[in-house]
């Protein structure tokens, strides 16, 4: 069964743009408004980060957003409860460290997720070899566990991950944490092009994407981008009009490969 998330991100003439927000940054009551705004801006899907006290993959902008959400006492369960009444039509993706999921309980977590528009899960601190902690619970559902692939992964590992991939492949474009970047590794284009050539699902580039030029760069070698820190910062600063224009322009970038 092809997952809804794969269908949404595949076979497009234009780059798929996935945005990231921190759930509860600005208060949980604003979450639905943020989601509807991003949907209206033309994005293909939205990642919702779950605040956590030890966010090892997060850069400074997202770390601060997580702290703001934690001060509001936002939890994974509270976010999923809120999402159960969401009117958003595009797929949502939960990005959570494994600890909050364990705390809630994996069966309860999956049960709650299925009552929401969530169609994908990203767990950055769950090693690929341990994915079976989650995947048995996802059998028969429309929810994909999204693999993250690093720049340093050898071809054999890329092929192994691609063969098992569902939803899409999250290609991490830098060695390090999230955050705005001005430059990327000179080998990134070759890496992404190879990954796309072997992947049965869309390949999206994430970590550091913050400009239309970045979107255009990655649209030449993969299926789209994930934009996080820039979105989080602009929402926090109240720059919604500027953000909406940026995302609309990003979603109009044509795929060149």
Curated annotation (Swiss-Prot):
It catalyses: (1S,2R)-1-C-(indol-3-yl)glycerol 3-phosphate + L-serine = D-glyceraldehyde 3-phosphate + L-tryptophan + H2O. Keywords: Amino-acid biosynthesis, Aromatic amino acid biosynthesis, Lyase, Tryptophan biosynthesis. The keyword Lyase applies. One of its GO terms (molecular function) is tryptophan synthase activity. Its EC number is 4.2.1.20. It comes from the Bacteria. The active site is at 47 (proton acceptor), 58 (proton acceptor). Transmembrane segments: none annotated. InterPro entries: Aldolase_TIM, RibuloseP-bd_barrel, Trp_synthase_alpha_AS, Trp_synthase_suA. GO terms for cellular component: cytosol. Pathway: Amino-acid biosynthesis; L-tryptophan biosynthesis; L-tryptophan from chorismate: step 5/5. Belongs to the TrpA family. NCBIfam families: trpA. Tetramer of two alpha and two beta chains. HAMAP family: Trp_synth_alpha. The alpha subunit is responsible for the aldol cleavage of indoleglycerol phosphate to indole and glyceraldehyde 3-phosphate. This is Tryptophan synthase alpha chain. It comes from Listeria innocua serovar 6a (strain ATCC BAA-680 / CLIP 11262). The gene is trpA.
